[in-house]
């Protein structure tokens, strides 16, 4: 399968100039058949953007998708469409998944991952940004994809939510934990 990468250095260079240089993270792990199906459901997509959206009192927006196990929440995010301005696409994803109007602040983490399933290796990128909103009401627009949204705290993401993700035993949740850990470290710097 040939996968087109439209989030490339040409797209990312202006983001680094505007939002700062991110921490680079490499990650590799074996994924299950179910995780492979999730990672390849859109064969043209090879990336996601994850948003650490903070409100005026530094709460973080968290979302839950219908297929998440009970108690699993994570920061929102999604894909940038081919030809779409990256920052506008990230803001669109924030609105769709949380109902929040958010503005990007910092480019926290750029991850290059290899998801291994049987004899296949799937290359994936995740770009993590912090964003700010003055909105306080969470109301997801895309209710087919998002089962719920709520406010959490950074210590909650680093503690109980992290432990729940790891307890699933799933590689893609371990990947999310690595992203969250790197982003939380970058936010403290």
Region locations from a protein language model:
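Nudix hydrolase/Nudix homology domain
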Residues: 1-7, 70-71, 143-189
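Acidic, metal-coordinating catalytic segment for phosphate/diphosphate chemistry
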Residues: 2-50
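Short low-complexity stretches enriched in small and charged residues
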Residues: 3-10, 18, 30-31, 57-63, ...
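Short, mixed-charge, low-aromatic patches
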Residues: 5-10, 43-51, 84-88, 114-117, ...
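Short N-terminal helix-initiation segments at or just after the protein's N-terminus
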Residues: 21-24, 67-77, 92-96
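N-terminal strand-loop-strand
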Residues: 29-75, 102, 106
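A short, hydrophobic secondary-structure junction motif
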Residues: 51-52, 129-136, 182-189
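Unchanged
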Residues: 80-103, 111-166
């Amino acid at each position: 399968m040939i996968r087109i990468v439209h989030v490339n250095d040409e797209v990312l260079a202006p983001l680094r100039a505007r939002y700062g240089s991110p921490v680079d993270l490499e990650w590799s792990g074996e994924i299950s058949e179910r995780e492979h199906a999730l990672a390849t459901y859109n064969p043209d997509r090879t990336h996601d953007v994850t948003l650490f959206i903070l409100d005026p009192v530094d709460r973080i927006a968290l979302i839950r998708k219908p297929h998440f196990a009970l108690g699993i929440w994570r920061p929102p995010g999604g894909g940038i469409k081919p030809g779409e301005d990256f920052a506008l696409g990230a803001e669109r994803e924030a609105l769709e998944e949380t109902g929040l109007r958010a503005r990007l602040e910092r480019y926290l983490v750029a991850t290059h991952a290899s998801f291994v399933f049987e004899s296949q290796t799937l290359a994936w990128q995740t770009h993590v940004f912090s964003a700010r909103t003055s909105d306080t009401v969470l109301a997801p627009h895309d209710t087919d994809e998002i089962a719920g949204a709520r406010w959490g705290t950074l210590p909650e993401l680093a503690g109980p939510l992290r432990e729940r993700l790891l307890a699933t035993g799933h590689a893609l949740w371990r990947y999310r934990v690595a992203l969250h850990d790197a982003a939380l470290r970058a936010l403290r710097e």
